[in-house]
């Protein structure tokens, strides 16, 4: 089975972008409270 680099990068970004967004949101919320 061939590995499609473009598909791999796309799926990686699809997982990574929301995760980073949630982490930033979480940090901002914590810094506001404390």
Swiss-Prot record:
Gene Ontology BP terms: photosynthesis, light reaction
Annotated Pfam families: PsbM
Keyword Secreted (UniProt): no
Membrane topology: Single-pass membrane protein
Domain of life from the UniProt record: Bacteria
Subunit structure as annotated in this protein's UniProt entry: PSII is composed of 1 copy each of membrane proteins PsbA, PsbB, PsbC, PsbD, PsbE, PsbF, PsbH, PsbI, PsbJ, PsbK, PsbL, PsbM, PsbT, PsbX, PsbY, PsbZ, Psb30/Ycf12, peripheral proteins PsbO, CyanoQ (PsbQ), PsbU, PsbV and a large number of cofactors. It forms dimeric complexes.
NCBIfam families, A to Z: PS_II_psbM
Protein name, entry field: Photosystem II reaction center protein M
Lineage, highest ranks first: Bacteria, Bacillati, Cyanobacteriota, Cyanophyceae, Synechococcales
